[in-house]
Amino acid sequence: LELSQFRGGMSNPTFMVTDGAEKRYVLRKKPPGELLPSAHAVDREFKIITALYGSGVPVSKPYALCEDESIVGQMFYIMEFQDGRVFRGVDLPELSAPERAEIYDNMADVLAALHEVDYTDVGLADFGRSGGYCERQVRRWSQQYEASKTEDLPVMDKLMAWLPENMPDDSLTCLAHGDYRLENMIFAHGSADILAVVDWELGTLGNPYSDLAYNCLPYYAPDPRRGNLIENNPVTSGIPSEENYVARYCKARGLSEIPHWNFYLVL
């Protein structure tokens, strides 16, 4: 066997394994050292990939989960290797405008497909709490901010007051990726087809619109490593505006709009 480590996906170290017949696999494991009990849960990743394999959501074929830490030092799992492309920059400078448009359309469609999965039918009813996701997020991060702040920031106090007062219906529940972004997809060579969505370590039962809002952050927030879409011109770039990207997602799910969209962006 030959082993080489991938760039990226480093929260849980990821390796390519090549056997004597030149067949390639992916090994993903917990990092070494002392860890929080709920952190780096590769068994949860394996469970969600196993549940989704064969559905309308593209994931790599799961092969085996090994919980015996004596084998490689930590729990790990093996899945199929996807020979494809990973794009780091959200503006896709290496592609043409029509290719960019198709990439973003497919990304929106796959997220919509994920949120349409009946998590009970695929055996993930116990994968998280049903309902109350936004309330838990507001409470948790407000507590984190209060515990770690070093100075008073009136704008944060205003935000923490605004969120609970403007919280929408919090009963919506779906299977959420938690880190759905361009970099966490493997695309086919020569086409915009998504071979697999990867890095499921934050997957849980959550709110679909919060998952979508996270995916739309490049339209608002600069990122020194991945770039942004703050000044995106859809006419020349081929990349849809945020409004049209969200509309594509809505169309795929049969929705007319996302109510309280600003709330999810702020959250």
Where do the model's predicted regions map?
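ATP-binding pocket architecture of kinase catalytic cores
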Residues: 2-175, 188-193
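Hydrophobic side chains within alpha-helical segments
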Residues: 48, 182-184, 214, 244
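A generic structural signal for secondary-structure junctions
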Residues: 83, 92, 146, 202, ...
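All-alpha amphipathic helical-bundle segments outside canonical DNA-binding/catalytic cores
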Residues: 128-129, 256-267
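Catalytic activation segment of kinase domains across protein kinase-like and atypical kinase folds
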Residues: 186-226
